[in-house]
């Protein structure tokens, strides 16, 4: 469903000048169309997930809608402090899109596993976790 999520993201960017994408050296292929259509609104901070989250928080504070994209494990665990302090506690509106759930990237080792994301996010009650199973689920979630 990565392709469908990228298409929905592109549609959001077409409909709103406020949407920005921040990635941490991931999304190649699936986000190429987004990057090509809106290079001035697409930011790749390199392999630096903490920076990605910090940039997104800063953008949100300036009134834009930041969307962070990364592998689920990298998106949640590496910038955890920023997510806890700003997105959860201060409720700064940052959208997070994670690729891969549970053991989808099993062959890459434990650093890529997101098998305990529900337990970790239970400590952050102001961050909603969605795990769409179908494209219809994804479309419904996207409307929120």
Residue ranges of model-derived segments:
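Thiamine diphosphate
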Residues: 1-144
